[in-house]
């Protein structure tokens, strides 16, 4: 369905980390297709900017995770929050599309609500895991909550939040090919043992995860001299950010690939993947993996008190059980990482059981078409 263009069709979009940037960019493409002439301003990464977003601030300035990591950035984050509030008051966008990043976006939503600007929130905060009281705040400041996990719409029943499961954006992706086909596409030797390492899209994640991943790679190379290691560089990062870590492992063969996380994982015999959206992105490639994560001691202590779920990896949450190993904090050591990857490389039954469970997770994500459904929701609330 096409909507008639209007001279003043402008919306506000805010997306922080790499996955949100991708989801928002695809939605913006659909919005522009449905309503030619529509423009957008706000905060986003490279994909949103390529799609036409007028970026008032870079995504990395607001995409910070963990209490200790956020504290030194608070002045800059609050400055961007105030700047977006002023921009919204001056430009009066027809609607706002806020993607993930709840600590920032819910505060912005409250400001937008006072201005009478309809708010569509895409990618629900994980209130089913912690801080469930936020449902009341969401009901006050969000007009439509668009959920990407199948159980989230039911969670909001009776809370006053207008929620809809729109399907997961990753459901758009075709079934994965063979490891050999991805290695060929990436220019990697097809016959060599290939291990993917996905350290994340934030500098703080690189700092905590890439060094132990590289040390684990050294151990794995000792057992597999032919092994090659591949690291996708998130769109929100520059290759130069990885160089200091790689410099300590000059004899280790590490191939950097700009973006293309799914292809890197698809090319692997096994993968080390940081917890978060990356685990689902990797899981959809149906490759055996180990999930790792580290926070500052303060952030982890707070999380342990607040989080109410048994698993942290998204694929485990969706499966309702531990289908992939989770190595957190001290357990995310080079020794444990190497041992778990070695088990997946050598134990055929463990590999096949994990892949079978990942197939079930993939099937639970709903039908393709999430960007279109989100675009229609935004157009539906536009003033």
UniProtKB/Swiss-Prot annotation:
Its EC number is 2.4.1.182. Keywords: Glycosyltransferase, Lipid A biosynthesis, Lipid biosynthesis, Lipid metabolism, Transferase. It is an enzyme of class 2 (transferase). One of its GO terms (molecular function) is phospholipid binding. It catalyses: a lipid X + a UDP-2-N,3-O-bis[(3R)-3-hydroxyacyl]-alpha-D-glucosamine = a lipid A disaccharide + UDP + H(+). Pathway: Bacterial outer membrane biogenesis; LPS lipid A biosynthesis. GO terms for biological process: lipid A biosynthetic process. One of its GO terms (cellular component) is membrane. HAMAP family: LpxB. PANTHER family: LIPID-A-DISACCHARIDE SYNTHASE, LIPID-A-DISACCHARIDE SYNTHASE, MITOCHONDRIAL-RELATED. Belongs to the LpxB family. This is Lipid-A-disaccharide synthase. It comes from Anaeromyxobacter dehalogenans (strain 2CP-C).
């Amino acid at each position: 369905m096409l909507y008639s263009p209007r001279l003043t069709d402008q919306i506000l979009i805010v997306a922080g980390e790499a996955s949100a940037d991708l989801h928002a960019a695809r939605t913006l493409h659909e919005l522009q297709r449905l309503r030619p002439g529509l423009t957008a301003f706000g905060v986003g990464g490279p994909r949103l900017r390529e799609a036409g977003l007028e970026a008032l601030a870079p995504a990395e300035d607001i995409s910070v995770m963990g209490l200790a990591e956020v504290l030194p950035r608070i002045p800059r984050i609050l400055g961007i929050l105030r700047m977006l509030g002023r921009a919204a008051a001056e430009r009066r966008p027809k609607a706002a599309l806020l993607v993930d990043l709840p600590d920032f976006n819910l505060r912005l939503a409250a400001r937008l609500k006072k201005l009478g600007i309809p708010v569509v929130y895409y990618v629900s905060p994980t209130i089913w895991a912690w801080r469930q009281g936020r449902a009341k705040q969401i009901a006050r400041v969000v007009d439509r909550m668009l959920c990407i996990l199948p159980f989230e719409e039911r969670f909001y029943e009776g809370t006053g939040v207008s929620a809809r499961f729109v399907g997961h954006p990753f459901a758009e992706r075709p079934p994965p090919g063979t490891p050999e086909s991805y290695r060929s596409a990436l220019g990697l030797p097809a016959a060599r043992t290939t291990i993917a390492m996905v350290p994340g899209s934030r500098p703080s994640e690189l700092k905590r995860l890439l060094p132990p991943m590289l040390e684990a790679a050294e151990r794995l190379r000792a057992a597999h001299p032919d092994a090659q290691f591949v690291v996708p560089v998130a769109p929100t990062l520059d290759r130069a950010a990885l160089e200091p870590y790689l410099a300590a492992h000059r004899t280790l063969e590490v191939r950097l690939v700009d973006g293309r996380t799914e292809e890197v994982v698809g090319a692997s015999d096994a993968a080390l993947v940081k917890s978060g959206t990356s685990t689902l992105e990797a899981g959809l490639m149906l490759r055996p993996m180990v999930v790792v994560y580290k926070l500052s001691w303060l952030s982890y202590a707070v999380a342990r008190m607040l989080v109410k779920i048994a698993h942290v990896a998204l694929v485990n949450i969706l499966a309702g059980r531990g289908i992939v190993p989770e190595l957190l904090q001290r357990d995310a050591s080079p020794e444990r990482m190497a041992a778990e990857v070695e088990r997946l490389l050598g134990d055929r039954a463990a590999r096949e059981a994990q892949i079978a469970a990942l197939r079930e997770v993939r099937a639970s994500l709903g039908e393709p078409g999430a960007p279109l459904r989100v675009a229609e929701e935004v157009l539906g609330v536009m003033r």
